[in-house]
């Protein structure tokens, strides 16, 4: 993972692209995108939790301690435990981020 197509020129030249087509993403195929939409709807602290938990889960995956599909489980379970809080300053951001990382690691250790 991921399966990648070999390309010989990695740059996208927008002056040569005639059209770009966008479709609604399939949230069954991309469930973490659904979590991001939910976090955006809930507000600031949820977005911070999503980010912190995702960073922990991705690092666990990259270090081969979890499967790719477990990223979703860790992030979703961390978000589920989160109680929305107001973010008033940078200290609040750091506090919520630290909490999310701690809970994400707890989720990993419980599995």
Language model regions located:
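Catalytic, metal-anchored helix/loop core of enzyme active sites in primary metabolism
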Residues: 1-111
